[in-house]
């Protein structure tokens, strides 16, 4: 049961990251605003 929960959380995290990268492809940190970082063209939310 615990393994299934961890797997589901990882799947959700990957889906969110893929969704963000498709919607908000970026070139530098200035395009992402104060709550995100641009890493290799992908928007990653930070806190």
Swiss-Prot record:
Propeptide feature ranges: 22-27
GO CC aspect terms: extracellular region
Source organism superkingdom: Eukaryota
Tissue expression summary: Expressed in salivary glands. Highly expressed in the head, body and tail with a 2-3-fold higher expression in the head.
Keywords from the named record: Amidation, Disulfide bond, Secreted, Signal
Keyword Disulfide bond on entry: yes
Disulfide bonds: 26-38
Modification Isoleucine amide occurs at: 46
Membrane spanning residue stretches: none
Record's signal peptide: 1-21
Localization: Secreted
Additional comment: Does not show effect on voltage-gated calcium channels, potassium channels, and tetrodotoxin-sensitive sodium channels. Does not show activity on Nav1.7/SCN9A, and shows very weak activity on cation channel TRPA1.
Role according to the record: Leech salivary gland peptide with unknown function.
Family the UniProt entry places it in: Belongs to the annelide toxin family.
Protein name, entry field: Peptide HSTX-IX
Organism of derivation: Haemadipsa sylvestris (Indian leech)
